[in-house]
């Protein structure tokens, strides 16, 4: 189900070999027998995106550097793309990786995102950042969130001032749902500090509010 280009200008060259022993979302045990010979289908399709920014986003220019990279619906495709390309450590500065449900664009204007918001986790340690990114990816494609239908996707942002992850959701006004998602996400990535939820509508303002709407 390959499509479009890979972010070759922003990442290291992919490894020559692709991991093939990935019959489950989580890394399988060594030597584990695999009964099914075919690919392991996911519950839904997901799409990787990337955004390599050459200058600060502003106004109508926002989103012009956003590119769709690959849509997949099997465990094997996920691990192949992750291992070769979609590790944050392969990104140059001022760039983003996204994993969103197929058909949903990582933009405020997308109908699935327009009334939503995001939980944000800052991270200044590269190893921890990459681990949290991978754990979130596996939780999403493995449908581990009870409120999975309210989740749009995840963004990994690499910046000189500090990296961060942002989990985008659909219905920002539903506090109970967002709080449950935030708590579950913290469990998934083993994060103990407070995190905040911001409405996309707040972020769109000329002078965005510095505080989040919800905190867990």
UniProtKB/Swiss-Prot annotation:
Disulfide bonds join 113-152. InterPro entries: TIF_eIF4e-like, TIF_eIF_4E, TIF_eIF_4E_CS. Recognizes and binds the 7-methylguanosine-containing mRNA cap during an early step in the initiation of protein synthesis and facilitates ribosome binding by inducing the unwinding of the mRNAs secondary structures. One of its GO terms (cellular component) is eukaryotic translation initiation factor 4F complex. SUPFAM superfamilies: eIF4e-like. It holds the Pfam family IF4E. This is Eukaryotic translation initiation factor isoform 4E-2. GO terms for biological process: regulation of translation; translational initiation. PANTHER family: EUKARYOTIC TRANSLATION INITIATION FACTOR 4E RELATED, EUKARYOTIC TRANSLATION INITIATION FACTOR ISOFORM 4E-2. GO terms for molecular function: RNA 7-methylguanosine cap binding; translation initiation factor activity. Keywords: Disulfide bond, Initiation factor, Protein biosynthesis, RNA-binding, Translation regulation. It comes from the Eukaryota. Residues 1-23 are annotated as: Disordered. EIF4F is a multi-subunit complex, the composition of which varies with external and internal environmental conditions. It is composed of at least EIF4A, EIF4E and EIF4G. EIF4E is also known to interact with other partners. In higher plants two isoforms of EIF4F have been identified, named isoform EIF4F and isoform EIF(iso)4F. Isoform EIF4F has subunits p220 and p26, whereas isoform EIF(iso)4F has subunits p82 and p28. According to the redox status, the Cys-113-Cys-152 disulfide bridge may have a role in regulating protein function by affecting its ability to bind capped mRNA. Belongs to the eukaryotic initiation factor 4E family. The keyword Disulfide bond applies.
